[in-house]
Design a protein with these regions (language model features):
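Bacterial N-terminal signal peptides that target proteins for export
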Residues: 1-8
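Hydrophobic alpha-helical segments
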Residues: 8-9, 69
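Bacterial N-terminal signal peptides
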Residues: 9-17
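Carbohydrate-interacting regions of secretory-pathway proteins
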Residues: 19-226
């Protein structure tokens, strides 16, 4: 019986290894613009202008496909990454973002899928150039916020920019078009909040549709694990 079990364990390990190698091979063969393509900086593309690997929760009509990515406009809704690379812990995220004037959006990290409501898990990094909320793009929402004067000449409405989030250990850095706008270190022993967790752990990524007056585009989503 032990010999039989050992043989089964070895066979299972071989199959798992084959599956992993097949996935790695498929990823290495992915062309630019295809999910799984790895660029020269080691980032893996996880969005290709379709819904593959993504799941919208409530108010699904708030989302559409446009300009090679996701377009958000409508009642509160969130679009979660559900692909095979999740969960993420220490990692980098790059997203190309474009906002219409007076628009509000958000990018969540270390979060988890939920059917409705504002995501409880993880942190939100704000997307907002000119909408009324004083917390602007690059803010770690209600934790360490960025004001408008820090974004002058960095990002503008109606123009694509790169939103780059780096998570290593207890530190979050946010770069907009290559400029560091936020550098936050989570204090040891930080407790989860009541209304929102606002605490590092691990999880997935989500994009926000904030309200019917806000139009935000998200595309070319790529990640690199550390």
């Amino acid at each position: 019986m032990k010999t039989h079990r050992s043989a089964l364990i070895v066979a299972a390990a071989i199959l798992a290894g084959c599956a992993s190698n097949a996935a790695d091979s498929a990823q290495s063969k992915a062309k630019p613009g295809q999910i799984g393509h790895v660029d020269s900086e080691g980032f893996t593309l996880i969005s290709d202008g379709t819904w593959t690997g993504w799941k919208v929760n409530e108010s699904q009509n708030s989302w559409s496909l446009s300009e090679g990515g996701f377009r958000a406009q409508g009642e509160r809704s969130h679009n979660f990454y559900t692909g095979p690379l999740a969960p993420f812990k220490d990692f980098e995220l790059k997203v190309d973002v474009k906002t219409a004037p007076n628009s509000n959006g958000g990018i969540y990290i270390h979060t988890k899928y939920q059917d409705s409501g504002w995501p409880w898990g993880g942190y939100e990094t704000q997307v907002n150039q000119t909408q009324g909320d004083w917390r602007k793009s690059g803010s770690i929402y209600s934790v360490q916020d960025v004001k408008a004067d820090k974004l002058e000449g960095v990002v503008r409405d109606n123009e694509w920019y790169t939103h780059h989030v780096v998570v290593k250990g207890n530190r979050i850095q946010i770069f907009l078009n290559g400029k560091l706008v936020n550098d936050f270190t989570e204090e040891p022993g930080r407790k989860a909040g009541k209304d929102f967790e606002r605490k590092l752990s691990e999880g997935t990524i989500a994009f926000q549709a904030h309200d019917p007056k806000s139009v935000v585009h998200y595309r070319n989503v790529r990640v690199k694990k550390h």
